[in-house]
Amino acid sequence: MSLTETTATFIYNYWYIIFHLYFYTTSKIIKYHHTTYLMIKFKASPPLNYINKGFFGIQATFTELKHLICHTSIDYAIDQFNNVPFPHVHTFVTKVLGNELIMTKDPENIKVLLRFPVFDKFDYGTRSSAVQPSLGMGIFTLEGENWKATRSVLRNMFDRKSIDKVHDFEPHFKTLQKRIDGKVGYFDIQQEFLKLGLELSIEFIFGQVVSEDVPHYDDFTQAWDRCQDYMMLRLLLGDFYWMANDWRYKQSNQIVQAFCDYLVQKSLENTCNDKFVFVHQLAKHTTNKTFIRDQALSLIMASRDTTAELMAFTILELSRKSHHLGKLREEIDANFGLESPDLLTFDSLRKFKYVQAILNETLRMYPGVPRNMKTAKCTTTLPKGGGPDGQDPILVKKGQSVGFISIATHLDPVLNFGSDAHVFRPDRWFDSSMKNLGCKYLPFNAGPRTCLGQQYTLIEASYLLVRLAQTYETVESHPDSVYPPRKKALINMCAADGVDVKFHRL
């Protein structure tokens, strides 16, 4: 058989392989030239840091899953910025499941992602579809005009009047105090704060006093935690979020929504409550109970977990450094004494400078949402990350995702917080350099999507911290506790191994 015949036979038998190779090569060439054209058009440069994690980015996906399971994904995300070819450039490009993903901790890039005229350049891409089975059409899943309209309604519900009555927190603190005093030895305070956070949230949202003896309460809390596990997995899978949709997830969503429907109905049947009730206020704008439920679910996620985790990480740090608690108690004693909570008000709590410094420092080291993602609605650029020194703009194609890791920004010694950025030091917040940080400090996001409940969370946490300092002389960390703590990254971040401590009464 001649060479010509052999070649013809090979082509005939393996035409599909040749066709795919030809198609793949041609598409790569076209993509290269199209990218070059776009870079010239948008005056962008190639990214200086590019991490190639193998074919299709499959290795990167499995590595992220492994760290997620081991509760080391946050530390892994931070380390990636330190292990790029040029660590002084705070942006890199990698490939995940076939898609090029931009990761950044650069405040200038983050500012573009968050502060462009709303919905102009970036949105949340597949995030809405990924979490919608759990959160419905809540504020966290809406985009565009629907989001604007809903946020406009909700914004008015977080004014000064709705959070002014701080003494409403006192019965809940007494419940927490009773639980703490009933413990023998070391116990996980994070679990107690999660219970407290849910009870506070339900009273604020539904006007109901709900405790563990309410029917299906335990089922709800377990299902809610499971929903958050699934939501995190679905977000990680990106375009393939639909793969994480088994019967456990569907069942958990049903339990959560049924419990919330029950609370909405009970709340609407009792409108005589003279306190501020979120559902009652929302019902003035709509009679759609499903819509009310969906907003309530988003608010539960934001309020219950954010406050609980802020308090848990605060106690974790105070239990390791007793002088901070002593300094806190001195400030409280000098202003109001250690015996009575009667003088605590919205305004007086905001005047506790060291209380605010402790909470700011906790939020710096342990932000409630340590990472986030945006997707380009059109081809555009980020201001930094390209060129020979990383100071040139880089291209962001339509549909391309950009992840920003706020905790990496907070812990970077170069960007703002100095060589001791990994050290819990509340006194840093009295330095003049801590003013007007902009996107260098993002405990509650920034721009149009800044957390509506920011003041509520801070006042609630301030009240609890002051009352704990008035009640307990010391808090002691378990001698076997690991530090820094492993961080479980769901939608919010919590201590993966809990916060085991022991309280000592005054």
Curated annotation (Swiss-Prot):
Stated role: Together with an NADPH cytochrome P450 the enzyme system catalyzes the terminal hydroxylation as the first step in the assimilation of alkanes and fatty acids.
Cited Pfam families: p450 (PF00067)
Induction (UniProt): By various alkanes.
InterPro entries, per the entry: Cyt_P450, Cyt_P450_CS, Cyt_P450_E_CYP52_ascomycetes, Cyt_P450_E_CYP52_fungi, Cyt_P450_sf
Protein name as annotated: Cytochrome P450 52B1
EC assignment: 1.14.14.-
GO MF term set: heme binding; iron ion binding; oxidoreductase activity, acting on paired donors, with incorporation or reduction of molecular oxygen, reduced flavin or flavoprotein as one donor, and incorporation of one atom of oxygen
Record: residues binding heme: 451
Family: Belongs to the cytochrome P450 family.
Domain of life per record: Eukaryota
Needed co-factor(s): heme
Enzyme class: oxidoreductase
Keyword field: Heme, Iron, Metal-binding, Monooxygenase, Oxidoreductase
